[in-house]
Amino acid sequence: MGKKKVKDRSAGTDSSSETAGPSCTHIRKGTENSVLKKACLNEHWSSCQDCEQDKPEEKQILEDQTDGESPAVWMCLKCGHRGCGRSGNQHAIKHYETPRSEPHCLVLSLDVWSVWCYICDDEVQYSSTGQLAQLITNIRKQVLTAPDKRNASKKSWKEDISVMNSAEQTQDEEKGKKGKQKSSSKQEDSPKSHQSAAAGSSAVVSVRGLSNLGNTCFFNAVVQSLSQTQYLRELLKQIAEEKSSFSITPALSSELDPLQIQLERPGSLTLAMCQLMNEIQETKKGVVTPKELFTQVCKKAPRFKGFQQQDSQELLRYLLDGMRAEEAKRVNSGILEALKSSGKNFEAEQTKKIVKEYEKDGAPKNFVDRVFGGAMSSTVMCKECKTVSLVTEMFLDLSLPVADEAYRKKNQKKAVQHRHSVSDDGDQDTSSLANGNEDMPTGTGSKYQQKKAKKQAKKQAKNQRRQQKQGGKVTLDAITNQSSTDPADSSMQTQTVSVNGSADAQPADTNQEDLSLEKHNEDQDDEEPEQEQAASVNNRFTALSEDQTTEDIAEQVNEDEDEIEQNCAEEEELVEELNTMSLTTPSEGDVENGEDTLEDVKEYTVVNRDPELAFRALASRTAPVKQECSVESCLYQFTEVEHLTENNRLMCVTCTKQQPGYKDGCKKAVYRDALKQMLISDPPVVLTLHLKRFQQVAYSVCKVNRHVQFPQILDLAPFCSLNCTGVKEGETQVLYSLYGIVEHSGTMRSGHYTAYVKSRPSTHNCVQNGTAAASGDAEASKGSWFHISDSSVHPVPEAKVQSSQAYLLFYEKIS
C-alpha cells in the first residue's frame, strides 16, 4: 500500500510539474507507455489508419477536398491510434469521442510535436525534463528513423510554415535549420485555432476562437463573420487611428455657410469593436475573449444580459445600430461645437433645425451605412389610372421568408381537426388543445421556464375553481362569455413574440401554458380521463355544493380573488417582458439612438414613370421551380409583385382628385386595386441575408429546418430595380461572393450557433471603394473555409459549408 501511494503521488507531481502554463490534469490517465512502444513498431506514420481503410473512391474525394495536401496526423498517447485532423472525416476526434472506460484525450501531432488535450480543449505545455517530454522524445526517434516518414515530415513541415502567421517558435528539432522561418502559434491543423493565413500576406485575417461568456454562442458567431468583413475592418481602423475632420459645404440654394467639423473620439461600442478586431488579427493566443465588446453591447441593449440564449440576427441589428447611433452622435456634437466656435448665437429650436440641415446637406455617411447600408424601392401602381408612386427605405439586412410546404400542410390539417373538435355549445375539446401544440419544439425547457409554466397552470386552475364556486350566482351563459374573453387569452392573442433562434424559450410560454395545465391535471387527477374532464366542465358550473353555505363560498371567493389579482399582476409583467422582446428597430430606449433612425417616415411620391417599366428589374428573372428552396427562390418571393385588393386596396390620390365634385369641396377618398413590388434600388457593399427560420403560426412558434441552398456567387441583378444606383450603365449583373455564414442547429428550446467563415486575401479595390472587382468576369475570392464553434476552429471543405443550415449569410460585392 505504501509503495502504491508513493507511486501515485510521484506520478501526480510529475504530471503537474511538466506543464509550463496552465496544468493539464489528464496527462497520467491519457498516456500509456507500454502500449505506445508496441504501436511504434508500425512504420506507416504519415497516414491516418482509418483513411487507409476507406474505399479508393472516398480517398480520391478526400484528396480533392483538401486540395491534394496530406492531412495532418494526430497520434493518441493512450493506444497509439493515428487519426487525421484536417480532412472532413476528422478521425482523431472521432476516436476520442468513442465511449471507453478511460479517456483517450491526449493526442500528439506527428508534424509539429505539440500535444493537445481534448478535455481541456487546449494545447498541453510541457517541459523538456518531464515524463511526457521523454515519451514524446522516444516517439520522435521512432518516427524520424523511418526514411519515408522523415522525408514526408520535412515536406509537410515546410508546407505548414508557409500557411501560418508569425507568432510562436515551433518545437521541431530542425528549427536551427529553419530558424529564419518563424511559425505562427500552432500548427494550422490544430484542433483549436487553425490559423488560416499566409505568412507573407499580412492582409489575410487570422481565424481565432472566441471564449463563450455564458450562452454567448449567438454573439460569437456574428463576431466571427464581422471579423472577416474586410471593408469594415479598414473603416474601423481609420476611425480609431486618424483624427477625423471634414468640411460641410451646403447646397447653393441653402443659406448656410460652409462649416469645418472636428469629430470627437469614437463611442465606447465602436472602440470595443475596433479593439477586438485588432486583437483577433495580432494576438498570439489561439482563443480571444470578447468580454469588453459584449459588455458594451449589454449596456446599449440590456436584454442580452443574464446569460440567456438569444437571437443572432437581433444581436447583429443592435450591434450595428448601436455603432451607427454613436457615429450620428459624433457628427451631431461636432456640428454643434463648430457652430459655437463660429460665434453665432441661435435659439435652441433654431440650432436643432440648423444641425439637421447640415447633416442632411453635407455630412458623410457613417461607416455602418457605407458597409452594410442599402436601399429598397417600393413601387405601387394604380390599376385604374396607371399612376406610379414610389417610396425608398433603407436597410442593413434583408429578412427573407423560408417556405415550408410540409409544415403548412400539417398546420392546415390540424386547423380542420380543430374546427371539428368544437362542440355545439361552444366548448372546445381539451384534446384539440394538446394537438394544437404538437408543432412546438421538443424539450422540457429550463427550470425557470418550467416554474413559470406551473404558475400559469395554477392560475388557470384557480380561475376555474372560482367560476365553479360562483356557479350558483352567475348563469352558465355569463360564465361562458367571461371565459371566452378571459384577459389571459386576450393577452395571448396580442403578444408580440420574439423569434429567438435558440433556447430562449420565452416566445413559447403562451403555448407551454396549455401543455403544463394538462400535465398538472394528469398528476393530480389520474383517475379522470381528459375527455371526461372536458365533457363535465359545463356540469360543474350548474350545481352549488349542498355542504357549503353562502358565507363560506363568499369567503373562499374573496381569498381566491386576492390570489388571482396577484397572479394577474405577474401575468401583466410577463406580457410586458414579451412585448419588449419584439424584433423592432432598436430605437426604443435600449440603444441610445440619436434623432435619426434607420426607418424614416414612409411617404409615397408620385413619379413620372412608364407603367410598363415600373416593375421591370435590372435583369430578367425566372420563376423558381416547384419545391425549390434556395436563396434565389426566397429573394424571388420577397420581390414578387403583389396584388392589392379588397381590404388592401390603395387610396389613389390621382383618382380622388379626378372624381366629380372634388373642386367643390368633396374630398371623399377613392380606393383602387393596385400592384406593388419591392426591389433593391441601392445594393450594399456587404449584403446580409436573414433566413426567417423561426415563424409564428397562431399560438405556436416553430423552426423551419428545411435546407436552403445558397450559392457561392450570388447575382442580385434580377432583384434590383431598373434604375439601380451604383451599377454602371449597360451592366446586367450585380455579383456577390459568400464569405460568412451563421448556422443555427437544434431546436427552438435547445440550439447552438456556429459560424463558417472564409479567410481570404484582401482586395485593394474593396478597401478603397467598397467593391472588389469591376468586370463581369468576377469570381469567388480564393481562400479557406473554417467552421468555428466558440473556441473550437476547424478547416472544412466547401461541400461541408454548402450542407450547413444557414441562418445568416454574408456576401461581399465583387462587381
From Swiss-Prot:
Compositionally biased tracts (Polar residues):
12-22, 478-510
Regions of compositional bias (Basic residues) in chain numbering:
411-420, 449-468
Which positions bind Zn(2+) 1? Answer: C24, H26, C117, C120
Q: Name one GO molecular function term.
A: ubiquitin binding
Q: Which residues form the active site?
A: C217, H752
| Keywords tagged on the record | Activator, Cell cycle, Cell division, Chromatin regulator, Hydrolase, Metal-binding, Mitosis, Nucleus, Protease, Thiol protease, Transcription, Transcription regulation, Ubl conjugation pathway, Zinc, Zinc-finger
Protein location: Nucleus
Q: What is its EC number?
A: 3.4.19.12
In terms of domain of life, where is this protein from? Eukaryota
Query: Might you report a single GO cellular component term?
Result: nucleus
Q: Which GO terms describe its biological process?
A: cell division; DNA damage response; mitotic nuclear division; positive regulation of DNA-templated transcription; positive regulation of translational elongation; protein deubiquitination; protein homotetramerization; proteolysis
Composition bias, Basic and acidic residues: 148-161
Q: What Gene3D superfamilies has UniProt attached to this entry?
A: Cysteine proteinases, Zinc/RING finger domain, C3HC4 (zinc finger)
Q: What class of enzyme is it?
A: hydrolase
Positions of the region Disordered?
A: 1-27, 148-200, 411-510
Keyword match Ligase: no
| Reactions catalysed according to its record | Thiol-dependent hydrolysis of ester, thioester, amide, peptide and isopeptide bonds formed by the C-terminal Gly of ubiquitin (a 76-residue protein attached to proteins as an intracellular targeting signal)
One Pfam family, please name it: zf-UBP
Which CDD domains does this one have? Peptidase_C19K
- Of which family is this protein a member? Belongs to the peptidase C19 family. USP16 subfamily.
Q: How is this protein named in the record? A: Ubiquitin carboxyl-terminal hydrolase 16
| Native source organism of the sequence | Danio rerio
